[in-house]
Amino acid sequence: INYDLSCLPNKFLDEAKKILPNKNYIGFSVTQGNFYRKKSWSIQNFIKLANKIILKGKVPVFFIEKDNLILINKIKSEVPGALFPEQEFNLSSPALVTALASRLDLAISIDNGVMHMIGLTNIPMIVLFGPTNSKKFAPKNNLIKILDSKNIYNSNDINTITVEDVEKLI
């Protein structure tokens, strides 16, 4: 799908530019909406990866709902300089998440709803899959790189995917 970002209301695009005014951002979407399938990659893996990208001069941006304070505080304590844009605004909307994602150089995500919002922006993205079907659920564009534990490690366990597997694709 080639979504035209200019269709987003200007208030969302303007807010995204205020929250993420520069470049060199790499986004992380780490939480799943449903819990009946184990499709979350270890938060420690995301933290390790975020710290590695900081060493490359990039800024990690975590897309985590603002009410998930325990997780946000854990990441803040272990990833200096990480940004949490959903804490910065009162507007809560898929349109704003999509506008924010358009400010990223790259996104790394598990299979979740935010991944689909990011996918609308046509930015490079690495998507990690475990038990879910990557052929069915991955965004469809040439900028998407898929790491599917079933294909790589013959396992439904997303945590068989290593930080190094992801880092190679950045």
Pin down the residues of each PLM region.
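Nucleotide-sugar donor-binding patch of glycosyltransferase catalytic domains
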Residues: 116-170
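A short acidic, often aromatic-flanked loop/helix-cap motif at beta-alpha or helix-coil junctions
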Residues: 8-10, 88-93, 151-156
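Short, well-ordered secondary-structure micro-motifs
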Residues: 37-40, 73-75, 138
